[in-house]
């Protein structure tokens, strides 16, 4: 196993950490509550810096954005939405019936309708919604 393999293993261990604050499990980006945009964008920047440094990316191949799931937005009366200059997107609309008890079975909530984040040319984002 060479250095690259060990580095790759370290990146995956970091990313798939079962800790509730691990990158795949944290809900900090989804439910900002009373957080100010500035504070959430500082956390976003730190996360991007960490991801890029852990992946040893060159300056011309840096990850520039983050798509966040596992953070139902209908609870905040929102659908797919972004912050940090359109670089961080929250895409979980709470479509799972598991969230039924949270809305007394209100599956017709306009923020739970099917929606897709379309990304074209690497950075052009458009939300496509069910009518």
Regions found by a protein language model. Give the residues of each.
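Feature recognizes metal-dependent phosphohydrolase scaffolds
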Residues: 1-131
């Amino acid at each position: 196993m060479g250095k690259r393999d060990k580095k790759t293993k370290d990146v995956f261990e970091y990313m798939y950490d079962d800790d509730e604050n691990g990158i795949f499990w944290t809900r900090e980006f989804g439910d900002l509550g009373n957080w100010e945009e500035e504070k959430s964008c500082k956390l976003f920047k730190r996360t991007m810096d960490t991801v890029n440094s852990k992946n040893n990316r060159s300056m011309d191949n840096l990850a520039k954005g983050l798509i966040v799931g596992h953070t139902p937005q209908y609870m905040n009366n929102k659908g797919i939405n972004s912050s940090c200059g359109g670089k961080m997107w929250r895409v979980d609309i709470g479509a799972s019936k598991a969230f039924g008890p949270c809305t007394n079975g209100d599956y017709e909530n306009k923020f739970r309708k099917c929606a897709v984040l379309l990304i074209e040319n690497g950075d052009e984002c458009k939300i496509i919604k069910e009518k």
